[in-house]
C-alpha cells in the first residue's frame, strides 16, 4: 500500500495521548467560546461636572427674592450617563442640579450631540432636579425685573457655558463606555407630601395635605462593569426640591442624596431624576438640617432598593420623541390685558404687562406650546416616560396603572420646563398648579382642559410604536 509522505504512522499509545491533548485544549477554550457567544449586552460610561457659578448670580425658583446669591452651601453638578446596546444604539441621560431645562438649551444640546456623537434627539433625555437654590437660566425684559440687562447677560453666559459642558460630558461618557450590565430595583421613601389643601372657601392653598395623592416609589437603575464595579446609580423621586429658601447655592435634598450615595459607593456617579412632583413638597422644610435629613433618607431608600433582588435589564434601546401642541384655554385681548394691568394684585398686573410686551414684540400670541413627550424602552422590561414641565403626581400614578410591562418609570422636569402641567382633576379644582401659577411667566393663559388626555394618549401611542 502506498502512503503519502505527509501522513505519519502512529502507535495506539500515541493516538490516545493525542486525543487526550485535544480534549484538554477544547476544555480550556470553552470559557473563551462562552464569552464570545454571550458578550455583555451593554456598554456604559458616566461622568460628573461641577456647575456651581463662580460669581454671585440671581437665583431661580422664588419670586420673592430681592438679591443675588450669597455663597455656596452645596456644589451643583451636571452628570451624564451613556448606554450603548449590543446593536450599537445609544442613549444619553443628562441630569442637572438646576431649576429646569430651557427649551433653547434642549434644542442646542440635542443638535450638537447628534452632530458630534451620532446620538439621535429622541435618544437624549435632559432632566432637572428643580432645586430652588440654583441660578436663574433665563431672564428677559418681559419679566420686568430690576437690573434686567445685567441679569440677562449673566444668565445668557451661564447657559451658553452650560450647553458646552453638557455636550462635552456626553462625549466623555461615550468615550468611556465599556462593557457593562444594568439592573433595576426599587423601594419607597416617605417625606414627600401632597401640598394642595382645600382652603375652606372653595379654593386650594399650598399647605401639607396628608390625605392627598403621592408617589413614594424610588426607582433605581444600577450600572456596573463586568468586573462588578459600580459605575452609575440612577434614582428617582417625586418631590419638589424646595426644602430650602435661602440665598446660597445648593442641590437641596436631591444634592445631599447624590452626595451620600457617591460616598457610599466610591467611583459611582449618582444621577437624580425628579418625578411627577408638581404638587409634592418635602415636609418638614425650611432648614439646612432638614434638607440634609431628607437627602439622607432618600439615599437610605436607594440603599434599601439595592439590597433587594434586582431585575437584570437586557435587550436593546428604543426611543420615541414627539412635541405636541398643548393649547391654551383662551387668548386675552389687548383690552383685557390693559384692564388687568390695573389689578390690585401685583402679579396679575405684572403678568398682563409681560404678555402685552410679548404681543407688541411678536405681533400675536401663540395658541399653543410645543410640549415634549418621550418614551424609552430600555431592554425588554423597562418603559421610561419623560415629560416636560412640572407634572403633577396623577400622571405617574395613572401611567403606572395603564402602560404595559413590568417596569414603568415616569419622570417630569425633562427636556423643557415651561410651567405646571395639571391633570384633569387638578385643572378642574383650579388653584396654583391648576393654572394660577401662570401669572409668574409669559404664557397668555392656563392650558386648555384636555391637557391630561392629550399627553396620556401621546404616551400610549409612542409606547405602542416601540413594540
Where are the model-predicted features located?
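Anionic-ligand-binding alpha/beta catalytic cores of soluble enzymes and soluble regulatory domains
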Residues: 298
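Bacterial N-terminal signal peptides
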Residues: 21-32
Amino acid at each position: 500500500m502506498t502512503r503519502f509522505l505527509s501522513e505519519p504512522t502512529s502507535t495506539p499509545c500515541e493516538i490516545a495521548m493525542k486525543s487526550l491533548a485535544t480534549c484538554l485544549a477544547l476544555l480550556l477554550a470553552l470559557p473563551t467560546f462562552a464569552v464570545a457567544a454571550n458578550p455583555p449586552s451593554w456598554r456604559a460610561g458616566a461622568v460628573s461636572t461641577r456647575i456651581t457659578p463662580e460669581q454671585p448670580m440671581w437665583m431661580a425658583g422664588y419670586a420673592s427674592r430681592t438679591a443675588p446669591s450669597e455663597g455656596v452651601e452645596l456644589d451643583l453638578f451636571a452628570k451624564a450617563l451613556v448606554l450603548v446596546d449590543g446593536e450599537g444604539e445609544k442613549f444619553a441621560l443628562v441630569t442637572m442640579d438646576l431649576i429646569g431645562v430651557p427649551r433653547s438649551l434642549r434644542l442646542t444640546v440635542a443638535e450638537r450631540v447628534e452632530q458630534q456623537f451620532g446620538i439621535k434627539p429622541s435618544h437624549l433625555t435632559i432632566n432637572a432636579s428643580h432645586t430652588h437654590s440654583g441660578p436663574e437660566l433665563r431672564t428677559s425684559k418681559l419679566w420686568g425685573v430690576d437690573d434686567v440687562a445685567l441679569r440677562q447677560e449673566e444668565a445668557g453666559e451661564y447657559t451658553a457655558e452650560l450647553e458646552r459642558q453638557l455636550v462635552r460630558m456626553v462625549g466623555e461618557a461615550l468615550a468611556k463606555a465599556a462593557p457593562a450590565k444594568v439592573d433595576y430595583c426599587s423601594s419607597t421613601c416617605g417625606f414627600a407630601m401632597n401640598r394642595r389643601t382645600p382652603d375652606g372657601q372653595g379654593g386650594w392653598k399650598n399647605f401639607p395635605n396628608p390625605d392627598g395623592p403621592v408617589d413614594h416609589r424610588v426607582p433605581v437603575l444600577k450600572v456596573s462593569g463586568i468586573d462588578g464595579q459600580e459605575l452609575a446609580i440612577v434614582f428617582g423621586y417625586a418631590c419638589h426640591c424646595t426644602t430650602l429658601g435661602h440665598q446660597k447655592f445648593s442641590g437641596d435634598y436631591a444634592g445631599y442624596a447624590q452626595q451620600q450615595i457617591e460616598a457610599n459607593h466610591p467611583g459611582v456617579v449618582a444621577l437624580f431624576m425628579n418625578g411627577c412632583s408638581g404638587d409634592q413638597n418635602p415636609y418638614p422644610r425650611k432648614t439646612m438640617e432638614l434638607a440634609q435629613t431628607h437627602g439622607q433618607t432618600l439615599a437610605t431608600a436607594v440603599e434599601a432598593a439595592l439590597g433587594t433582588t434586582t431585575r437584570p435589564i437586557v435587550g436593546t434601546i428604543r426611543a420615541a420623541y414627539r412635541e405636541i401642541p398643548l393649547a391654551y384655554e383662551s387668548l386675552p385681548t389687548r383690552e383685557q390685558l390693559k384692564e388687568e394691568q390695573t389689578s390690585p394684585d401685583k402679579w396679575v398686573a405684572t403678568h398682563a404687562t409681560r404678555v402685552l410686551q410679548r404681543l407688541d414684540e411678536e405681533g400675536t400670541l401663540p395658541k399653543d406650546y410645543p410640549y415634549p413627550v418621550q418614551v424609552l424602552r430600555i431592554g425588554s422590561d423597562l418603559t421610561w416616560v419623560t415629560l416636560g414641565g412640572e407634572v403633577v403626581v396623577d400622571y405617574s400614578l395613572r401611567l403606572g396603572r395603564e402602560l404595559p410591562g413590568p417596569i414603568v418609570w415616569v419622570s417630569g422636569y425633562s427636556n423643557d420646563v415651561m410651567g405646571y402641567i395639571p391633570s384633569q382633576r387638578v385643572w378642574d379644582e383650579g388653584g396654583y398648579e391648576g393654572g394660577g401659577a401662570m401669572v409668574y411667566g409669559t404664557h397668555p393663559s392656563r392650558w386648555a382642559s384636555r391637557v391630561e388626555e392629550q399627553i396620556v394618549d401621546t404616551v400610549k401611542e409612542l409606547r405602542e410604536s416601540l413594540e
